[in-house]
């Protein structure tokens, strides 16, 4: 196959991808929502094989390093309480962009943490940001689909959510020996950038007239 043929094929695929992104096609939404669903488990679990190496790096006990897992899971739970009402009030796109930016910044801070205490604190923020993807993915599915289509989309999201916690440590284990724990967080950073780009391409799915006007106090009282 000639270079010209390769070039034409690549150009055709790029045009196809651009059309899917521009129109927010079903395939684009499936990929985006699937990645957002897997985002939280990857944030919490992908670095697990790196725990011993991180203990040596920060010169601390393994129990202290494991606090990073605990705080990220706390953040994952707290973030759902935060991003759920935000996405109902301000739409899906703005909170999603905020979550992605928050994740990117917190991941960079994790990479440059000077001690284990800073790292644990930044992991909490990472978990909060990761929760945004899980909550908003389900909300977008409910906005865009109904009936059997919604059931199929939620089934796919549920399957991904079940598989991701198993796959994430395996992927982390494969890469840990080659690139170290910083490399694992570099992969997470790259994933965050990809999702940020996808979030900018995403069109708002919740019209203003359907948004909630309730106050934060009402949310917690309910």
Annotate each predicted stretch with a short phrase:
Residues 28-62:
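Extracytoplasmic
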Residues 124-160:
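Cytoplasmic helix-loop-helix junction between adjacent transmembrane helices
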Residues 45, 73-81, 165-166:
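Residue-level signature of mid-helix packing/kink "hotspots" within the transmembrane helices
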Residues 118, 155-200:
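Helix-loop-helix hairpin linking two adjacent transmembrane segments in secondary transporters
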Residues 117-123:
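Short hydrophobic/alpha-helical segments at membrane-entry points of transmembrane helices
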Residues 21, 207-222:
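Juxtamembrane intracellular "pre-TM" segments in multi-pass secondary transporters
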Residues 78-116:
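Conserved MFS/SLC helix-loop-helix module at the cytosolic interface between two early adjacent transmembrane helices
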């Amino acid at each position: 196959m000639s270079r010209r043929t390769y070039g034409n094929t690549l150009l055709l695929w790029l045009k196809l991808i651009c059309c899917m992104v521009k129109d927010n096609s079903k395939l684009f939404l499936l990929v985006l929502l699937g990645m957002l669903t897997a985002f939280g488990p990857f944030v919490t679990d992908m670095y697990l094989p790196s725990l011993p190496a991180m203990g040596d790096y920060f010169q601390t006990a393994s129990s202290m390093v494991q606090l990073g897992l605990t705080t990220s899971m706390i953040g994952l739970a707290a973030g759902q309480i935060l991003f759920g009402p935000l996405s109902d009030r301000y739409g899906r796109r703005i909170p999603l962009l905020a979550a992605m930016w928050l994740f990117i910044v917190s991941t960079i801070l994790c990479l440059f943490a000077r001690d284990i205490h800073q790292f644990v604190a930044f992991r909490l923020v990472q978990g909060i940001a990761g929760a945004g993807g899980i909550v908003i993915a389900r909300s977008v599915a409910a906005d865009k689909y109904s009936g059997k289509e919604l059931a199929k989309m939620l089934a796919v999201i549920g399957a991904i959510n079940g598989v991701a916690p198993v796959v994430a440590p395996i992927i982390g284990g494969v890469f840990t020996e080659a690139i170290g724990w910083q490399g694992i967080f570099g992969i997470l950073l790259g994933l965050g950038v990809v999702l940020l780009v996808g979030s900018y391409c995403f069109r708002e799915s919740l019209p203003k007239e359907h948004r909630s006007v309730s106050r934060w106090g009402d949310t917690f009282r309910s």
